[in-house]
């Protein structure tokens, strides 16, 4: 008998909106897939390192109650897993008798710091003294929890990395959702400026701003926006905008011709392949990106509206110089900029909410069909 998701309750677990980029993704995602299901119930968490052991246990109990409240055989659990998202991970650990899927935001592992409670996060030596030497153990723990489940990555390179580490799992790749945002001025009518956008943390490349500024001509302005950017230092040719939402966010993207994504290695544990929420956000505003080829960014190209700089073994100064040259080659060329705008438009449609819902709907339907056949 064909699977009809409208007969199912979706139990959704993820960080609340504003709790890191994954929380923003979660808010867009759950609203996008809601029409697929008969019912959607949620358990939203705080960000990594913000919750106590008691709170983690509370989330686990709440998820169990949400599962029990659904019709037997008609409940599906989906979680958003990120490097330190302990509450989501431990909420799905050990669940039996109910199908569970998860989106892995920092592949190949869903979680890298399974003990990152508030106490552990507040003590750097404890945090890494515990997790770094126990990397093989944490990988085995995740293999026990998720090794034979269906996992979704937001890039093909991410999906391949999961399959290499957890060969028994079923892995799908669905591109990062691109949300609807207002249509702004054409790229060629915007000021000659580039933006840095996103949450400030290790690996996002905000430390490259000063180097890139030195390499750019004076008539190209850098504007910086996002959570945590208010603590950064501006200067001549560098405008710190700070956190933006709503109309302020619209205005920020309307003031730049491209967004720079100079990602590098996020942590020293292993290579990871996260998709970029900042790329998706830029594309939502029909704004191309200039980026490095770190992680999942390597999959992008001009047909997706991205000018990708292959950095190889370049040092930080060389990376900044290469990015600056790419920036100028794009924002100084109206014809090329307009062409990138057309590519962004096509990529937006391919990764829109409806296309994302269709892709996840297929993954869930196929998984539930396999589950029914195996029973």
Each language-model region and where it sits:
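Helix-loop-beta element that forms the nucleotide-linked donor phosphate-binding surface
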Residues: 143-150, 159-178
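Short N-terminal targeting/anchoring amphipathic segment
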Residues: 65-87, 99-105
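Nucleotide-activated donor-binding/catalytic signature segment of Leloir-type glycosyltransferases, i.e.
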Residues: 228-258
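A charged, aromatic-enriched C-terminal amphipathic alpha-helix characteristic of glycosyltransferases
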Residues: 185, 314-318, 331-368
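Conserved donor-binding/catalytic core segment of Leloir-type glycosyltransferases
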Residues: 185-204, 210-213
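Membrane-proximal helix-turn-helix segments that form the acceptor-binding/catalytic region
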Residues: 94-96, 119-151
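Nucleotide-sugar-dependent
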Residues: 261-280, 291-299
């Amino acid at each position: 008998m064909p699977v009809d998701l409208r007969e199912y309750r979706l139990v959704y677990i993820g960080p609340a909106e504003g709790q890191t980029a994954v929380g923003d993704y979660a808010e867009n995602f759950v609203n996008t897939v809601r029409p697929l299901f008969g019912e959607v119930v949620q358990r939203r968490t705080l960000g990594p390192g913000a919750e106590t052991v008691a709170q983690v246990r509370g989330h686990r109990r709440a998820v169990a109650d949400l599962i029990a409240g659904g019709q037997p055989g008609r409940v599906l659990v989906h979680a958003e897993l990120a490097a330190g998202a302990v509450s989501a991970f431990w909420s799905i650990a050990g669940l039996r008798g109910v199908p569970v899927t998860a989106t892995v935001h920092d592949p190949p592992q869903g979680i890298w710091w399974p003990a990152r409670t508030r106490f552990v996060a507040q003590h750097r030596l404890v945090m890494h003294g515990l997790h770094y030497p126990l990397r093989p153990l944490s990988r085995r723990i995740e293999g026990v929890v998720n090794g034979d489940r269906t996992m979704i990555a937001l890039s093909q390179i991410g999906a391949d990395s999961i399959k290499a580490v957890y060969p028994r799992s079923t892995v799908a790749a669905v591109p990062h959702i691109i949300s609807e945002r207002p249509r702004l001025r054409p790229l060629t009518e915007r000021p000659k400026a580039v933006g840095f956008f996103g949450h400030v943390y290790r690996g996002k490349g905000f430390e490259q701003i000063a180097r890139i500024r030195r390499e750019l001509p004076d008539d190209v302005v850098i504007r910086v926006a996002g959570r945590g950017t208010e603590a950064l230092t501006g200067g001549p040719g560098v405008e710190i905008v700070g956190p933006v939402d709503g109309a302020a966010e619209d205005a920020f993207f309307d003031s730049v011709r491209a967004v720079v994504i100079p990602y590098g290695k996020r942590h020293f544990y292993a290579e990871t392949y996260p998709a970029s929420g900042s790329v998706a956000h830029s594309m939502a505003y029909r704004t191309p990106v200039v980026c490095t080829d770190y992680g999942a960014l390597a999959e992008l190209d001009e047909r997706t509206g991205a000018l990708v700089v292959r950095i190889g073994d370049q040092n930080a100064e060389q990376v900044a110089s290469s990015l600056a040259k790419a920036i100028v080659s794009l924002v100084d060329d109206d014809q090329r900029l307009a062409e990138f705008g057309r590519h962004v438009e096509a990529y937006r449609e391919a990764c829109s909410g409806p296309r994302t819902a269709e892709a996840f709907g297929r993954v869930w339907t196929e998984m539930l069909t396999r589950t029914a056949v195996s029973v």
